[in-house]
């Protein structure tokens, strides 16, 4: 139990800090359209695709690794609440097209990135780069 909590906490600390950095770097470039949230969600979706495929191939890994990567790191990196707040802010400001576009880009893009992550793992496996 304690090892699981430590794994989740350590992963969450790393993921949250990366999300904060992405926001600081990218949102300064385009403050009207906060790309930090989108980058965090798309990166997290791509990485979870890789993680899903990797953990399926390595069932012998301790469950703490999955907790560290998926629950901790990726759970803290990706942000449904910030995405929701940003889209709701657009709706409140009457920017309906921007809100609907943002929703479509976040959701469809995240699904596509998860599929791309799974495909990335498959391609690396075929190249012999990982999991022989």
From Swiss-Prot:
Could you tell me the membrane topology recorded for this protein?
Answer: Multi-pass membrane protein
| Cellular compartments annotated | Cell inner membrane
* Keyword vocabulary terms for this entry: Cell inner membrane, Cell membrane, Ion channel, Ion transport, Membrane, Metal-binding, Sodium, Transmembrane, Transmembrane helix, Transport
Locate the transmembrane regions by residue number. 5-25, 36-56, 68-88, 103-123
Give the top-rank taxon of the lineage listed in the UniProt record for this protein: Bacteria
The UniProt entry's GO biological process terms, in alphabetical order, are: cellular detoxification of fluoride
Q: Where Na(+) is bound, by residue? A: 75, 78
Using the UniProt record, give the first listed, main subcellular location: membrane
- GO CC terms: plasma membrane
How the protein is activated or inhibited is described as:
Na(+) is not transported, but it plays an essential structural role and its presence is essential for fluoride channel function.
Q: Which reaction does it catalyse?
A: fluoride(in) = fluoride(out)
Report a single Gene Ontology molecular function: fluoride channel activity
- Family matches, as InterPro entries: FluC
Q: Which NCBIfam families match?
A: crcB (TIGR00494), PRK14196.1 (NF010792)
What is the protein's known function?
Fluoride-specific ion channel. Important for reducing fluoride concentration in the cell, thus reducing its toxicity.
- Protein family according to the UniProt entry: Belongs to the fluoride channel Fluc/FEX (TC 1.A.43) family.
User: PANTHER family from the entry?
Assistant: FLUORIDE EXPORT PROTEIN 1-RELATED (PTHR28259:SF1)
What is the designated name of this protein?
Fluoride-specific ion channel FluC
Q: Which organism is it from?
A: Chromohalobacter salexigens (strain ATCC BAA-138 / DSM 3043 / CIP 106854 / NCIMB 13768 / 1H11)
Gene from which this protein is expressed: fluC
